[in-house]
């Protein structure tokens, strides 16, 4: 699992555009956070708040669908909102109250949905 996650992180890092005029420092998560195995059942329990805005059918009416996305993508997004690296007040507030285990659980749950 760790090798797969590391490979995904590397590919995301290498595919990041270096030609943009305005660049932020790369957001880095520690390996200990990336190694957390998310509990899908716990993620399902927590997901009701997310599903208020993120539609189950992944339709995008200004709010992206998250079902079926890669675990690493969801983990990074939630940590970026939590740390105010990404801008969106609602997502910053929602992610701000989540712990590492809760983020891993939500990521595992939403990644399991197709």
Question: What is the predicted function of each stretch?
Answer:
Residues 79-100:
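Short Fe-S-cluster ligation motifs
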Residues 21, 25, 77, 96-114:
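C-terminal capping alpha-helices of c-type cytochrome domains
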Residues 15-17:
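N-terminal signal peptide c-region/cleavage motif recognized by signal peptidases
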Residues 43, 48-57, 106, 110:
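The canonical Cys-X-X-Cys-His
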Residues 21-46:
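Electrostatic cytochrome c docking/interface patches
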Residues 64-69, 93-103:
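Electron-transfer interface patches adjacent to heme c in soluble/periplasmic c-type cytochromes
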Residues 7-13:
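Bacterial N-terminal signal peptides
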């Amino acid at each position: 699992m760790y090798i797969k996650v590391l490979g995904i992180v590397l590919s995301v890092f290498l595919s990041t555009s270096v030609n943009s005029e305005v660049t932020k420092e790369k957001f880095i998560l520690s390996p200990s956070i990336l190694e957390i195995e998310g509990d899908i059942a716990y993620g399902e329990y927590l997901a009701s708040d997310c599903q208020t805005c993120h539609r189950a059918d992944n339709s995008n009416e200004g709010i992206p669908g998250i079902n079926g996305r890669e675990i690493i993508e969801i983990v990074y997004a939630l940590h970026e909102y939590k740390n105010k690296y990404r801008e969106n007040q609602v997502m910053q507030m929602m992610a701000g109250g989540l712990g590492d285990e809760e983020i891993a659980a939500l990521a595992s749950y939403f990644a399991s949905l197709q």
